[in-house]
Amino acid sequence: MYYEPDKADHGLPHDPLKALVVPRPIAWISTIDQRGRVNLAPYSFFNLVAGDPPCVMFASSSRVDGARKDSHLNAERTGEFVINIASGEQIDAMMTTSLDFPPGHSEFREAGLATLPSVLVRPPRVARAPAHLECRYLKTVDLPSNDPKHINSMILGTVVAVHIDDAIIVDGRVSIERLRPVGRLGYRDYAVVHDGFAKEVVARPPLRIGSLG
């Protein structure tokens, strides 16, 4: 099949595009507003985009009324956020925090989650998450939108501190079998990544052009 996203002429019940770019890692983002109130929400448009210094991005769409979401606003206004990596055991709690609570309402409390203090930033961490990235806000890039009332934004941050549960480190490396991160698939589907493999790049022999004869 072939279709053009602007025309939405795929002929399927649901747009298949997000079911192709998978699995997408999920940033479980904790922030704090200017009044000291904590927010927690998952974002599946997320990735590490640079290594030195390490930079991450998450993308946020506006609410139905056009207002920017709390995680986005808090990161911009306070300059800080924490990315918690959710494991398979935490998916129900993570889904609870995806609900649309009013500003200032505690998603931590609703999901029954304990907090841990961060070291270099103010937003707390999810206590039982296997890894956390403390981040400082870098900038926001507004992205195109086909709906003038709908805002798409990419928020960039620099990772300033990393926490890893020692239990997921095996032989000096993070074990994907122990990390078991939650990933987003298409539609309403999710995956828990727990199986990986190593593959060496095989060097190709140099090409011989002509003859030395």
Language-model-detected regions and their locations in the chain:
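Basic, polyanion-binding surface patches
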Residues: 1-213
